């Protein structure tokens, strides 16, 4: 009879322990909100490179001029993921050619963006399919612009600011 009571007490204790642990985990899961999305903005390739998941917890990549926040897929695009080569870069050419080779990832210091105009029909279709996938799955957070475009936009802003103050 005493052994029945011991089994009952141990079972009750384990039940309470597990229930308390589950509630604690559920509360922390419920309390964690989806991270705030960055405001829409323009990114140069050098700026985009900062969002590769190593220096910054956010992971972005660009396809056909659109910058996507792929942080929620960081197990794929983050530092240890199979698509990590694309994190912080314009992934257009690599995805179109289904390749992770460095030769298909544009240099972040390049003055002009890769327009992918030399892709064949099959590669263009693959790129369009990837773009459609990213449009449905991930939040667009900006546009990829060339450093030349960024300098031109900065000059226009400075001119507008000077005119406004006069």
UniProtKB/Swiss-Prot annotation:
Belongs to the cytochrome b5 family. MAPR subfamily. Residues 42-145 form the Cytochrome b5 heme-binding domain. It is a single-pass membrane protein. One of its GO terms (biological process) is ergosterol biosynthetic process. The modification Phosphoserine is found at residue 108. InterPro entries: Cyt_B5-like_heme/steroid-bd (IPR001199), Cyt_B5-like_heme/steroid_sf (IPR036400), MAPR/NEUFC/NENF-like (IPR050577). Interacts with erg5 and erg11. One of its GO terms (cellular component) is endomembrane system. Induction: Up-regulated by sre1 in response to absence of oxygen. Heme binds at residue 138. Pfam families: Cyt-b5 (PF00173). This is Cytochrome P450 regulator dap1. It comes from Schizosaccharomyces pombe (strain 972 / ATCC 24843). It is found in: Endoplasmic reticulum; Membrane.
